[in-house]
Amino acid sequence: MNKTQGNLQDLFLNVLRRDNTPVTIYLVNGFQLKGVVRGFDNFTVVLDADGKQQMIYKHAISTIMPFRPVNLMAESRAQAEAKQ
């Protein structure tokens, strides 16, 4: 696996967090959570919904759907240029 593939999840979550993009997170049990991603690490995502924070374990997440499109290609290019 190359480095870009390994960081796709972090890239996606970081863009959502930075842009305060509202998301719906679907859990493996079918439950839906709506809010804004405030932070994440290797194992968890922190979601802010109506002023309340929830820590969700990534192994419980099925799908993350942003309310607006996320341009990962532009973000990936910007990060690559910043490294040069």
Curated annotation (Swiss-Prot):
GO biological process, one term: regulation of translation, ncRNA-mediated
Presence of keyword RNA-binding: yes
Ranges of residues in domain Sm: 10-70
PROSITE patterns: SM
One function term, GO molecular function aspect: RNA binding
GO-annotated cellular components: cytosol
Pfam hit, one: Hfq
RNA-binding keyword on record: yes
Keywords: RNA-binding, Stress response
Gene3D superfamilies per record: 2.30.30.100
General function of this protein: RNA chaperone that binds small regulatory RNA (sRNAs) and mRNAs to facilitate mRNA translational regulation in response to envelope stress, environmental stress and changes in metabolite concentrations. Also binds with high specificity to tRNAs.
Family: Belongs to the Hfq family.
Cross-referenced HAMAP family: Hfq
Oligomeric form and interacting partners: Homohexamer.
Name the record gives this protein: RNA-binding protein Hfq
Organism: Moorella thermoacetica (strain ATCC 39073 / JCM 9320)
